[in-house]
Regions:
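Regulatory sensory and allosteric helical modules in signal-transduction proteins
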Residues: 85, 91-127
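Short beta-strand-centered segments at strand-helix junctions
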Residues: 14-26
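Short regulatory alpha-helical segment in sensory/regulatory domains of signaling proteins that mediates
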Residues: 63-74
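Short hydrophobic/glycine-rich mini-motifs in sensory/regulatory modules
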Residues: 42, 140-150
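Juxtadomain coupling helices with adjacent low-complexity linkers
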Residues: 56-65, 97-103, 148-182
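Short beta->alpha transition motifs characteristic of CBS
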Residues: 85-91, 151-156
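Short hydrophobic alpha-helical segments used for membrane anchoring or interfacial signaling
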Residues: 73-85
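A short, aliphatic-rich beta-strand micro-motif
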Residues: 133-141
Length: 182
């Protein structure tokens, strides 16, 4: 599975430069964690590491519990993909790549709420059949770094309903962030 082969030298400190083209293609940003694997054939493999992805089944269970309580679509994401989803519309978003609008919202940190009065936001790059009119997004912070988000989306877009979802989203994001720190 060799898509690209580039020869690089290791410097005195043992560092290898990953070319900008490869970083851009694989969406590797400065400061992103990478796992390093070795094989018996002398290969060194780098893999993007997602702390939120490590939560796996736990994140899925948390999303299901939150969806049952709120009747909203609940998405738990890392910085690029929807890791866990529950509620109406789950199949459309689970495992999908996040839209640029959502990625930008995650990078802003904190909690962001959009209502039906504004333009609807697609959670993923894939076109959703019914765009949510209201979204509450809370960034998951772990050791001061933004690792992903908890997104609660509501079809009606009513501000009162979104205000009720906001503390639940913040609590979920804080809980998952603290869980990753351990």
């Amino acid at each position: 599975m060799k898509a690209t082969g580039i020869v690089r030298r290791i410097d005195d400190l043992g560092r290898i430069v990953v070319p900008k083209e490869i970083r851009r293609t694989l969406r590797i940003r400065e400061g992103d964690p990478l796992e390093i694997f070795t094989s018996r054939e002398g290969e060194i493999m780098l893999k993007k590491y997602s702390p939120v992805g490590e939560l796996g089944e736990f994140a899925q269970s948390y999303a299901q519990a939150l969806a049952q309580t709120t009747d909203a679509l609940v998405c738990i994401t890392d910085r690029e993909y929807v890791i866990a989803a529950a509620g109406a519309g789950k199949k459309e978003v689970e495992g999908e790549h996040l839209s640029e609008a959502v990625e930008a919202m995650i990078e802003k940190r904190g909690t962001i709420m959009t209502t039906g009065e504004e333009a609807p936001i697609s959670i993923t790059q894939k076109v959703m059949s019914a765009l949510p009119k209201g979204v509450v997004l809370s960034s998951i912070l772990c050791n001061g770094d933004c690792q992903g988000a908890v997104i609660l989306s509501e079809k009606s877009g009513q501000k009162e309903k979104l205000e009720q979802l906001k503390p639940l989203s913040v609590t979920a994001a804080n809980f998952l962030g603290k869980n990753m720190e351990q």
